[in-house]
């Protein structure tokens, strides 16, 4: 449904005169006359711009963050009698209240295979051509979405946006020339790529506990290990659910002092008393790490605080902005009073 956070998003967007991105077939039905989005736009007596979101069958990101379920996407193939084209036609017929300005594609999250974006873009151009051939209308805009990868650990690479977006633009131009179509206005959404590296989460170390491992234990590089040090911190899955939910990996650094040159294999764990409450699965930290130290976990600017919760009644930490002019609190730390303010006593 179109209810989120207690707000009916479709009429709210129409009231604000915003460009709408339609990503749910229930918002506009192929039947046409009862299209809910059209009804909302009619209520405010104004024409609203709309993009239609297309899903693709790419298994490139974690299954829980993929935007394109393979079976669903195959059912929405870009052919003349496909549901995607049918919905576009239905929206186009409602030009009195809905101005169809383009299509939107989003194939997943943190994708390292740059060629997948090119394949999705080519399909979008073919859909655009098919729509033009049947309705003589050139969709002027195509949003090719986001999902560009960033490096979370030392062994990963961030996608080179300058290079890959250049390749993507060239591919779009080439396909449109071959199709005899004018190039659309192209937009991209490098949200994670932009925001993730700007965030660092600071944790205070609690218990530090070495645990002997079996003779067959190995680290992620395949080297035999006999001991792992469990480093507990004052946070965890309440402030960063991604490791527990997606198996996401991070790294960590000792932030408050220079530690010993000797390191030990460590696993940084949260405070929620669950085996899945892992902050960093494997990292080498100074051997003298101790209670009270501060650990910095980088690349938490995206999908960190925005996915934070009060799980186990944990309080959501503050956000501090740091720049050349100094540091200032951007979002204050949550308090017990904040948490209890939701309770209703009668």
Model-predicted regions and their roles:
Residues 1-20, 31, 39, 52-55, ...:
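Active-site-proximal beta-alpha core segment in soluble small-molecule metabolic enzymes
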Residues 5-6, 67-70, 113-117, 152-157, ...:
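Short acidic, glycine/serine/threonine-rich loops at helix termini
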Residues 25-27, 32-56, 60:
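Polybasic, low-complexity intrinsically disordered segments
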Residues 104-106, 143-145, 232-234, 298:
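Short beta-strand segments
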Residues 108, 140-156, 187-198:
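Flexible glycine/acidic-rich beta-alpha junction loops that bind and position SAM and/or redox cofactors
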Residues 112-119, 151-164, 195-207, 280-285:
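Short glycine/threonine-rich loop-to-helix capping motif typified by GTGT followed
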Residues 159-176:
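Glycine-rich and small/hydrophobic secondary-structure elements
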Residues 173, 177, 181-346:
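Charged (often Lys/Glu-rich) extended helix/loop segments that serve as interaction or gating elements
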